[in-house]
Amino acid sequence: TNVSLRGGGERIKYYSSLGYMKQNGVSDKYSYEQVNMILNTDAMLLSDKSLKFTFNLNGNTSNNNKPADGEGVFNNAMYGDWMPKRPAAWSTGLPRKGSVEAQLNNGFNNTESYRFQMNAALKWSVPWVEGLSAQASLNFTTSYYHQRHFNHDQEGVYDNPYATAVSSYNPENANLYEKWNKYKLLTGIFQIDYTRSFGKHNLSAMVNYQSQVRKSNWTDAKKKGYPTTLAPQLDL
């Protein structure tokens, strides 16, 4: 789903857009959801249109959810010669340990992400010097994501066709891994351009200066030993 708005006049033009997307996988354990936002603006600040200001914003947020083994579940199902021999249930109807369905229920691997970009630029075409222009721009990018990966023994399954109790659950096999990542990039650019034609000859020259400040940091933590799979949390 996408909604956009475009408009403006002779000296000012703008475009904005808001989009939403949701996709489900072959199993309800897989899903992807994303929201996008865009805002672009161009403005001529002087009546002779020699000074142009550009301002752009765009960002998105997304949620990517999948089981603990991720795509590996179906890679095994498609390429492993043993998987077709393991139906979802035993001959007695009991849910079978090690089946594709069982591997979809041994945890989760979820990632929440945010990304934002901003660009502002000012370009001046010098009126009294043909072909000469100067431009300054500032670009800012930041992103953040939080990953939670919880893995545990398969639940609600049976080791053999005649088992009288579900497969045992070992709390020590349950582990939770979380990671937080932040990234920022600030870029400043100043540029002078000169383009001129003299008869059959063309002359082009450019002077450019660029400066960047980059920052990134991440933190991760892991814990094992969960007596229940209902609400795994880290004690930080």
Where are the predicted features?
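Surface-exposed loop/interface segments of Gram-negative outer-membrane beta-barrel transport/assembly proteins
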Residues: 1, 25-36, 40-117, 133-236
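Short glycine-rich, acidic/polar surface loops and turns
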Residues: 2-6
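A generic beta-sheet turn/junction motif
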Residues: 7-11, 20, 196-200
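His/Asp/Glu-rich mid-to-C-terminal helical/loop segments that flank catalytic regions of hydrolases
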Residues: 124-126
